[in-house]
Amino acid sequence: MKTIFYIALGGGLGSVLRYLTTLVINKYVQTTFPYATFVTNIAGCLLIGLFFGYLEKQNAVSPYLKFFLITGLCGGYTTFSAFSNENIQLLQSNQILIAFLYISLSVFLGLMATWTGLIIAKEL
């Protein structure tokens, strides 16, 4: 039960952070490309790399911190469902190039961000 509490707490915080990130990005960037979800997901990948890399080095850290940060916070912050829905909308509106770029950049940069986070965390 304690594990579920920490996941829920992190997930709630991550969801609020995603909402705030979306508000800020949409305030300054208005275009067909879904920048808010894109930036959120790439930032979430960097965070999960940082958290996982850091926690991997720490033996005395509570396992609940891992549930809070990785499963909860990062899980609540990033959003694969919005990514999928936005790509379907782009394809349905015949914006195939933008959908292709969004998918390709999200996967490539997401992997690079996670890897970068792991490297940074291991150097700390």
UniProtKB/Swiss-Prot annotation:
Coiled coil: none annotated. GO terms for cellular component: plasma membrane. InterPro entries: FluC. It catalyses: fluoride(in) = fluoride(out). Na(+) is not transported, but it plays an essential structural role and its presence is essential for fluoride channel function. Keywords: Cell inner membrane, Cell membrane, Ion channel, Ion transport, Membrane, Metal-binding, Sodium, Transmembrane, Transmembrane helix, Transport. Belongs to the fluoride channel Fluc/FEX (TC 1.A.43) family. Fluoride-specific ion channel. Important for reducing fluoride concentration in the cell, thus reducing its toxicity. HAMAP family: FluC. This is Fluoride-specific ion channel FluC. It comes from Flavobacterium psychrophilum (strain ATCC 49511 / DSM 21280 / CIP 103535 / JIP02/86). The gene is fluC.
